[in-house]
Amino acid sequence: METVQEKTYENIYYLLWEAAQRYQKFTQFRVIGKSHDDRMIPMLEIGTGDLCIFCIAGFSGTDGQMSDRLAETAVELCRNYECGWTVQEFYEVRKLLDQTRLCIIPVVNPDGYEICRKGYGTVRNPIFRQMLKMQDRPTDGFPCNARGIELKQNFPTNYYQRQKIHQEPASENETRALIGIFQEYKSAGLLTFGYSHGKIIYSRQEKGFAYNQRNYRLARYLQKCSGYRLEKGKTASGGLGSKGNNPDMGSPEQFYAEVIRQPSLAIEIPVSHRDIMKEIRQLPLEYIYSL
């Protein structure tokens, strides 16, 4: 399984927009914000439920085709909903999404996505472009946005630690866009999708026994249907790493757990997995079913 993107950012944007135009009765297209290089961040809502589940990918260029697959999954779920189909002979898509709708954001870092595809020349802002070129970093698997900031470490969590001088939490447009949508919508969970070796990481709170138990229970449900390894997220009380930092501090999953206080899971699908679409489609439906 290659991790190089197949689609352009514009392909993904218009794929979601066209789905909302075709399935107007039960979808809504929305731009939640703009990147620092002035690219819009699209979101597609599917279903009519009062609560929602956020499904997000594309924080880093290392996510590769995950943004592509999540966008395609959104369109497929729309088709399943309209036709009243059951997925894998078990999940009644229309019934589940009218209970809890999905808010799908396939590419939260469109600048990084395009940099991985076409290099630094795709950055429109000449100042940002020159700054990135001066860093002399390879663009393959580029983990940052157009300002060279890793979004996965930019959220204002407890015990946040700066990775660079003058870097502050929520300094990036993309980060603030997600924080705004998290706080605006009444949600029941966050699922982020990326590539790794097949694991589900569930976030924890320092003094949140009930929250931690609920998050663990939902993570176990997803583990059973995926076969992935279950991994516990770290809190500050769990100790810091050898370099004095904690990989979960500053992450969107930890922020969501601390501020929204709803279950937050990072789903890392194996790069070699043959049917990524099946996993991306099944896990959000299983999550809603298990609520």
Predicted regions and their residues:
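Short beta-strand-to-loop junctions in surface cap/lid or active-site-entrance loops
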Residues: 42-51
